[in-house]
Regions:
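Aromatic-rich, lipid-facing transmembrane alpha helices and their immediate juxtamembrane interface loops
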Residues: 1-148
């Protein structure tokens, strides 16, 4: 059975994650080329797909992190330990997704303004996305009384 506090934290995390990933996807879309269609009417559907995938990955990363932490008392105990692991899992997933879609599948490409992490050959923006959006979402979703 899931405690009310856990439900509350998960709802806030998923909601803030969806809003954060929505804003990020819209703002960093110009850093990509080749995946946005010529018709402006298709762009919202592609962005929605990205946001849905990002939100589901954020939930999966947090679930895996809570499990890896081995603490069934989350969010009351081990909140930030699980949060740090969730961010790490998200960054690893982002690196894999960027590599897969840019270099293997060719689903999208980076435009010239996208800064690249040299040793990983992936864009800086998606990596920052998977540090900042989950980090802020975890901060906002934390239970009352938990230290910042």
């Amino acid at each position: 059975m899931i405690s009310e506090k856990r439900r509350f934290a998960l709802r806030r995390y998923i909601t803030s994650s969806a809003f954060g990933h929505s804003a990020w996807e819209i703002l960093h879309a110009p850093l990509y080329r080749g995946w946005m269609p010529g018709l402006i009417s298709e762009t919202p559907l592609l962005l929605a797909r990205c946001v849905i995938i990002d939100t589901l990955l954020a939930l999966a990363a947090l679930s895996l992190a809570v499990w890896l932490t081995g603490n069934s008392g989350w969010p009351d105990a081990g909140y930030w330990a699980a949060g740090g692991r969730a961010i790490a899992v998200g960054v690893v997933l982002a690196i894999f997704a960027e590599w897969l879609n840019v270099y293997l599948l060719g689903t999208w490409n980076y435009s010239s303004p996208m800064p690249i992490v040299p040793f990983l050959n992936v864009g800086v923006s998606p990596l920052l996305q998977w540090v900042l959006v989950p980090g802020l979402s975890l901060w906002w979703a934390r239970p009352k009384g938990l230290p910042d």
